């Protein structure tokens, strides 16, 4: 799904509003995913998945850092996320559906924290962006 110039502007503006809260929102999105979609916990058997866990916060920071990198490389997501794609496809072997579940959880998290900025247009742009990130992360599964 191609991001239009308007989509790119919406994604950059929304992620700019996330700012210093990126790691916090990443962790909250993971917690939300684990609660809403319990089967996703199977990929984290060694984690303490309780609320506020340092491990969930740490992984949330990694998710946020990857998304921040992606926002900075909207015209070259495959290049920016190549190593992460290799990791998830070849080492971690994460079922691709889980990226959609995390994307949904992240959208809900962003909507709850940025209600005035989360317009239908921004929602659509972020959804397209996250779908593109998911596509890139699963591209090496084939």
Swiss-Prot record:
Chain positions with Phosphotyrosine modification: 25
PTM sites of type Phosphothreonine: 109, 135, 138
Globin domain ranges (all copies): 2-142
Positions bound to heme b: 88
List of residues that carry N6-acetyllysine: 17
Listed CDD domains: Hb-alpha-like
Residues annotated for O2 binding in this entry: 59
An example Gene Ontology biological process: hydrogen peroxide catabolic process
Tissue: Red blood cells.
Gene3D superfamilies: Globins
Modified residues (Phosphoserine): 4, 36, 50, 103, 125, 139
Modified residues (N6-succinyllysine): 8, 12, 17, 41
GO cellular component: blood microparticle; haptoglobin-hemoglobin complex; hemoglobin complex
This protein's UniProt keywords: Acetylation, Heme, Iron, Metal-binding, Oxygen transport, Phosphoprotein, Transport
Function: Involved in oxygen transport from the lung to the various peripheral tissues.
Assembly notes: Heterotetramer of two alpha chains and two beta chains.
Name of the molecule in the record: Hemoglobin subunit alpha
Organism name: Bos gaurus frontalis (Domestic gayal)
């Amino acid at each position: 799904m191609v991001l239009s110039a308007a989509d790119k502007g919406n994604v950059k503006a929304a992620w700019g509003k996330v700012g210093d809260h990126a790691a916090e929102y990443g962790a909250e999105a993971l917690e939300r995913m684990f609660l809403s979609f319990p089967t996703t916990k199977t990929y984290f058997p060694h984690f303490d998945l309780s609320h506020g866990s340092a491990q969930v916060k740490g992984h949330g920071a990694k998710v946020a850092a990857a998304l921040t990198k992606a926002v900075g490389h909207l015209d070259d997501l495959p290049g920016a996320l190549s190593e992460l794609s290799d990791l998830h496809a070849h080492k971690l072997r994460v079922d691709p559906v889980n990226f959609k579940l995390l994307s949904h959880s992240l959208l809900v998290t962003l909507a709850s924290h940025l209600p005035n900025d989360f317009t239908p247009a921004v929602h659509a742009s972020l959804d397209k962006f996250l779908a593109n990130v998911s596509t890139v992360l699963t591209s090496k599964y084939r």
